[in-house]
From Swiss-Prot:
Functional note: Core component of nucleosome. Nucleosomes wrap and compact DNA into chromatin, limiting DNA accessibility to the cellular machineries which require DNA as a template. Histones thereby play a central role in transcription regulation, DNA repair, DNA replication and chromosomal stability. DNA accessibility is regulated via a complex set of post-translational modifications of histones, also called histone code, and nucleosome remodeling.
GO CC annotation, single: nucleus
Entry keyword Phosphoprotein: yes
GO molecular function (one): DNA binding
Protein name: Histone H2A
Top-level lineage group: Eukaryota
Gene giving rise to this polypeptide: his-3
InterPro entries the UniProt entry points to: Histone-fold (IPR009072), Histone_H2A (IPR002119), Histone_H2A/H2B/H3 (IPR007125), Histone_H2A_C (IPR032454), Histone_H2A_CS (IPR032458)
Length: 127
């Protein structure tokens, strides 16, 4: 008999705990693992890969939702619309770079007026 562990039988019949809850995530780790396996990205998929992927996707979603919520609040709205997502993504330098090739349906465009088109300042010095 080795002196490691507490000995005795292992617990059986315990309540099943999802990998998402073990990792403290909302995104589905098991579903992402299945998608990675079925997608023919590699022959084998490590146990940590879907957890890491779920964490990254959850972080990105939370970041976009927070910025979109701020944009909605700035426009005095309580519901996030595609326009708010567009404003959030395009006003954030890093998200804009990440989603440069993405078109958001019903998102509109950023308001932008070229400086040369603005009326000239008439700074007449009166004495």
């Amino acid at each position: 008999m080795s002196g490691r562990g507490k000995g005795g039988k292992a617990k059986t019949g315990g309540k099943a705990k999802s990998r998402s809850s073990r990792a403290g995530l909302q995104f589905p780790v098991g579903r992402l693992h299945r998608i990675l396996r079925k997608g023919n990205y590699a022959q084998r998929v490590g146990a940590g890969a879907p957890v890491y992927l779920a964490a990254v996707l959850e972080y990105l979603a939370a970041e976009v939702l927070e910025l979109a919520g701020n944009a909605a609040r700035d426009n005095k709205k309580t519901r996030i619309a595609p326009r708010h997502l567009q404003l959030a993504v395009r006003n954030d330098e890093e998200l804009n770079k990440l989603l440069a090739g993405v078109t958001i349906a019903q998102g509109g465009v950023l308001p932008n007026i070229q400086a040369v088109l603005l009326p000239k300042k008439t700074g007449g010095d009166k004495e």
